[in-house]
Amino acid sequence: MAIPWVEKYRPKTFEEIVNQEEAKYTLASWICAKFKAPREFCTRWAKKKDKEIVEAKAVLLAGPPGIGKTTIVHALAREIKYELIELNASDVRTGERIKQVVGRGLREASLFGYEGKLVLFDEVDGLHVKEDLGGLETIVEIIEIAKVPVIMTANNPYDPKFRPLRDIALVINLKRLSEDDVVEVLRRICANEGAKCEEEALRSIAKSSLGDLRAAINDLQMYLSSGKKILTVDDIKRVGERNPQLSMFEILDRVYRARWFDEARAISFNPSFDWEQYFLWALETIPTVYKDLELMAIAYDRLSKADMFLGRIKKTQEWELLPYALELSLGGISQVKNKPRLPPFIKYGFPQRLLLLAKSKEARRRREALVEYLAQNLHVSKSFVKSELIYVLSAIAKKDHSIIDRLSKALGINALDIKNLLL
């Protein structure tokens, strides 16, 4: 069986990692400031002395899939001769299990002359706080007491539930690789495999990978399977290109960084694009991207016009208006006049409206159940209960609280639920 090329051509040293210089300098500076590391390595890579770097208890590598987050940790461990204790947080989820695996790894003696140990929690954003009992808390505990380097990786560490990790870790953002970066790696692999690959074919693979080098290498291996030694653009067209799934953070980033109107508009064709969710996110991220008040006003004006189209669609079901709403909310907010040069990384916040809805989900569920119960027992419609009855009962209850107990006894409903509904 052929070795997967993503493993065969995985970078072994810092030098081999493509176009992540800033991340490499920051990570090396943290390691060299706090732990034992070879002098040659520190001289070459430890370029920073920031207080934030020196005081950080751990490192959290952030960025989209396939850009080298795990690879950079493997290369680091090899460079400084540390034994790597690797845990995928998506697989080992409970606090007890994490303690067992990490504890065993730290207790066991290192073989082969390692200088120390390094703990890697891969894909920590795969933890779901409620389901994965104690997983997040255990990782925080380990970081607080560990005398060895602890590094984590995540595609999206900015979910509010991961705040405890961000508070104690140095967040290092790895950037998405450019099309040229990916093509250069693919070209080198083709040469090593003795394959003749058309430049246009490699560019097609790189373009559809959206900076995910792992995906691009996997695609190249697929196209050159069965000993095939020639790759043309016709081969790509015949098999078909990758249509990647994008997170909302990635969708927003592509919209704001689009170079022209059609590039931003085309994002709506991605299978993971949800226009209702996107609208909520766009509403709150405009001030994050455009600091200038004039640019902010232009973007919000276009988004408000898109909202008018969406309101009309919901009211009249005229779905032929949706393209106009998408053009305004995608290309409209992306292509503003005198658009500034955007920084390499933008921290997009989770929409507060969605957070509030999540927090009030149980209260809304109980309210809806109570409305339905009242409608059935009083032989009226739910809309009548919501639009009229609740307001009448609420007005009475504010003057006479005893009505809550009387309603509770008459209808067999918890008095606290009635109170929450009316007051």
From Swiss-Prot:
Disulfide bonds: none annotated. InterPro entries: AAA+_ATPase (IPR003593), ATPase_AAA_core (IPR003959), P-loop_NTPase (IPR027417), Rep_factor-C_lsu (IPR023935), RFC_lid (IPR047854). Heteromultimer composed of small subunits (RfcS) and large subunits (RfcL). Gene3D superfamilies: 1.10.8.60, P-loop containing nucleotide triphosphate hydrolases. Belongs to the activator 1 small subunits family. RfcL subfamily. The keyword ATP-binding applies. It comes from Pyrobaculum islandicum (strain DSM 4184 / JCM 9189 / GEO3). One of its GO terms (biological process) is DNA replication. It comes from the Archaea. GO terms for molecular function: ATP binding; ATP hydrolysis activity; DNA clamp loader activity. Part of the RFC clamp loader complex which loads the PCNA sliding clamp onto DNA. PANTHER family: CHROMOSOME TRANSMISSION FIDELITY FACTOR 18, REPLICATION FACTOR C SUBUNIT 1. This is Replication factor C large subunit. ATP binds at G63, P64, P65, G66, I67, G68, K69, T70. Keywords: ATP-binding, DNA replication, Nucleotide-binding.
